[in-house]
Amino acid sequence: MGNVPAKLDQDASSYTGRSTYTDSSSASGVGAFRGAGGTMDETRARGRRTSSLVGNILNGPTSSRNDPTGEVSKKQLSAAKKRGTKERELLKEENAKKLVIKYNETVDGGYLAPHGCYSLDKMDYDSDIVRKLIIERKLAPFYIPLQDFDDSWTKDEVKKIVDALPLHAPFNEHVEEYEDVPVGDLNEPHFDYLIDKKLSKKEQKKMHALIFKARLYRKRLRWQESENNAYLEEKLQNRDNDIPKNSFLPNDDLKYDLYAQGSECPICFLYLPMPLNYSKCCQQPICSECFVQIKRSEPHFPHDEVDPSQPQKDENEKDPNLLISEPANCPYCATPNFSITYTPPTGRKVGIGGQAPNLYKPLGTAGNAPPTYTVSSDDIRPDWETKLNKERVRLARRSANATAIHVSNRLIGPQRTGSFANEDSPGVAGSTDSRSAGVANSTLEELEKQMIDEAIRLSLQDEKRKAKR
């Protein structure tokens, strides 16, 4: 939008030639139109310039910068959108793969991926960051939970119960949302052939997103089942050995030490090995699977007090820069900027960076105490600010589009009707045009100014965003 003045000059010069042609042609035609011809041509030229601004704002700043003519091939835009969609889908698949529990990725008796107490769509944290924090022992690992624990259980009873635990919680194979949704061959990367081409483009887009979600759910189920089967196979082969041959399987001492001194998470009410994470503000325990659910609010406008005597503003009329995303509050005491602290166990360092789980022996607790680490809910979702800015841009464009469409409708409707009427009735042209020319000029000048102001505002916002980066 920074090139608005140049665009206006260019349009003005090109339309001047058209005005000359109109004057010369009208001279040999209707004499009555001659007096008001210059005024009406100027009005039409201004209308075209304003319509050009409307088009620029509707098309957005990107298209006008990439293509100086303002004309971008529809095929190119469509191809770019498809590439963007495919890249986003590949990223989602990669993230889903990292949410699969693997029995050979273990830290201190827990794992790098969640057990499955919550649905996949809630696991939108940065999995690379969480995995790194667990490996560095700055966040409690994801443990396999027990529904309950009885202090009277013997070591053999605890061993049998732990041996029966599945690596991942059972999946619901019949999700209502995905019923009757075709998924096709999951080994094939493309699935557009499953979409009914008779649907509108909007409906096809919705169907594409739904099929992708259903396919991803099925793929994740398949990936996790494969890991579950491998884990079960290894356990069956080593069930009669006090010390498993597979170095990633825990021995009996580790199984007992993990669960004999556990604790219940007050949010999910599941029993898990210690130590857990603790809220920094009120020192309440919270498991990692519950912690990763807690995040900032979605971008929204501040909740101002509503004055019933004043008309309520539509979202399109509000300043997009007022959008906010409030930090997460503690689920226990509602303190803002929620963070947890974690102190790794002193006598148990197994798996990645420690002893082999099958050779576990309790370590001595003498010596320096391990450091305590702090992790905030923003640390595991560092892209919150990017999402907020994207929503601001989206709302700004939506507001600009609404303004542009409104102005365009005001320009096209009465102006074109009046022009066509004058051309069909040349005898009345002089009187009608002379009366309406002043009003038309005034209205178009006002609309042109409004569109220029809008263009400048969007350009300034764009520059501010660039400066922040």
Curated annotation (Swiss-Prot):
<feature type="compositionally biased region" description="Polar residues">
    <location>
        <begin position="11"/>
        <end position="28"/>
    </location>
</feature>
<feature type="compositionally biased region" description="Polar residues">
    <location>
        <begin position="431"/>
        <end position="441"/>
    </location>
</feature>
<feature type="compositionally biased region" description="Polar residues">
    <location>
        <begin position="50"/>
        <end position="67"/>
    </location>
</feature>
<feature type="region of interest" description="Disordered">
    <location>
        <begin position="1"/>
        <end position="86"/>
    </location>
</feature>
<dbReference type="InterPro" id="IPR039301">
    <property type="entry name" value="Sip5/DA2"/>
</dbReference>
<dbReference type="GO" id="GO:0005737">
    <property type="term" value="C:cytoplasm"/>
</dbReference>
<feature type="compositionally biased region" description="Basic and acidic residues">
    <location>
        <begin position="301"/>
        <end position="320"/>
    </location>
</feature>
<keyword id="KW-0963">Cytoplasm</keyword>
<comment type="function">
    <text>May negatively regulate the SNF1 kinase.</text>
</comment>
<comment type="similarity">
    <text>Belongs to the SIP5 family.</text>
</comment>
<dbReference type="GO" id="GO:0042149">
    <property type="term" value="P:cellular response to glucose starvation"/>
</dbReference>
<feature type="region of interest" description="Disordered">
    <location>
        <begin position="414"/>
        <end position="441"/>
    </location>
</feature>
<feature type="region of interest" description="Disordered">
    <location>
        <begin position="301"/>
        <end position="321"/>
    </location>
</feature>
<protein>
    <recommendedName>
        <fullName>Protein SIP5</fullName>
    </recommendedName>
</protein>
